[in-house]
């Protein structure tokens, strides 16, 4: 199966799971709480190589994944809805799409609130003050409330890459250095 087809398949699975979770959260009136739990889960995934391995590796059995996720749910006190959802995802051997589910849920929640979403890549985690300032700047440009999905990528060295819809603003140090390198090649 070509890579494009695989990513579309994963995206479709993630969107279906996210849609189901969103509908359950909407019925329970807990979209904000579920979103907060999903943000905590993403932070756990981003901060733990072992958890990343558990999620993506086909070596772990469904039972091993279920036990690990159940322990995680207990340890971090995820709500009943999110806890049960994670267990279902683990039992169905779909943990590998969990980051996609989280992203799709955020998009659904933002759309429900009339927000637009910006994907932001930063060399380091943003502080709460930086995130608030970024949201305010993006609201000034777009005229709408903006939810931000921050991804940390140390390889950009510094600055930000911001994607809002089809627009991208790249102020990363890596890009600036690449541009300077090209300019120097043209001069010499």
Swiss-Prot record:
GO terms for cellular component: plasma membrane; proton-transporting ATP synthase complex. Keywords: ATP synthesis, Cell inner membrane, Cell membrane, CF(1), Hydrogen ion transport, Ion transport, Membrane, Transport. It holds the Pfam family OSCP. It is found in: Cell inner membrane. The keyword Manganese does not apply. The keyword Phosphoprotein does not apply. InterPro entries: ATP_synth_OSCP/delta_N_sf (IPR026015), ATPase_OSCP/d_CS (IPR020781), ATPase_OSCP/dsu (IPR000711). SUPFAM superfamilies: N-terminal domain of the delta subunit of the F1F0-ATP synthase (SSF47928). It is a peripheral membrane protein. Its main location: membrane. One of its GO terms (molecular function) is proton-transporting ATP synthase activity, rotational mechanism. F-type ATPases have 2 components, F(1) - the catalytic core - and F(0) - the membrane proton channel. F(1) has five subunits: alpha(3), beta(3), gamma(1), delta(1), epsilon(1). F(0) has three main subunits: a(1), b(2) and c(10-14). The alpha and beta chains form an alternating ring which encloses part of the gamma chain. F(1) is attached to F(0) by a central stalk formed by the gamma and epsilon chains, while a peripheral stalk is formed by the delta and b chains. F(1)F(0) ATP synthase produces ATP from ADP in the presence of a proton or sodium gradient. F-type ATPases consist of two structural domains, F(1) containing the extramembraneous catalytic core and F(0) containing the membrane proton channel, linked together by a central stalk and a peripheral stalk. During catalysis, ATP synthesis in the catalytic domain of F(1) is coupled via a rotary mechanism of the central stalk subunits to proton translocation. This protein is part of the stalk that links CF(0) to CF(1). It either transmits conformational changes from CF(0) to CF(1) or is implicated in proton conduction. Belongs to the ATPase delta chain family. HAMAP family: ATP_synth_delta_bact. This is ATP synthase subunit delta. It comes from Rhizobium meliloti (strain 1021) (Ensifer meliloti).
């Amino acid at each position: 199966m070509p890579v494009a087809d695989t990513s579309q398949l994963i995206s479709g699975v993630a969107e279906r799971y996210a849609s189901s979770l969103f509908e359950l959260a909407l019925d329970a009136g807990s979209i904000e709480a579920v979103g907060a739990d999903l943000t905590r889960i993403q932070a756990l995934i981003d901060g733990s190589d072992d958890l990343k391995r558990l999620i993506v590796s086909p070596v772990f059995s469904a039972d091993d994944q279920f036990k690990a996720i159940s322990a995680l749910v207990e340890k971090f006190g995820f709500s009943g809805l999110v806890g049960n959802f994670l267990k279902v995802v683990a039992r169905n051997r779909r943990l590998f799409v969990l980051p996609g589910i989280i992203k799709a849920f955020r998009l659904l929640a933002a759309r429900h609130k009339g927000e637009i979403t910006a994907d932001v890549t930063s060399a380091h985690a943003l502080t709460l003050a930086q995130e608030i300032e970024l949201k305010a700047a993006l609201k000034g440009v777009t005229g709408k409330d903006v939810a931000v999905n921050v991804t940390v990528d140390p390889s950009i060295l510094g600055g930000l890459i911001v994607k809002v819809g089809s627009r991208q603003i790249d102020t990363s140090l890596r890009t600036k250095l690449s541009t300077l390198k090209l300019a120097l090649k043209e001069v010499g």
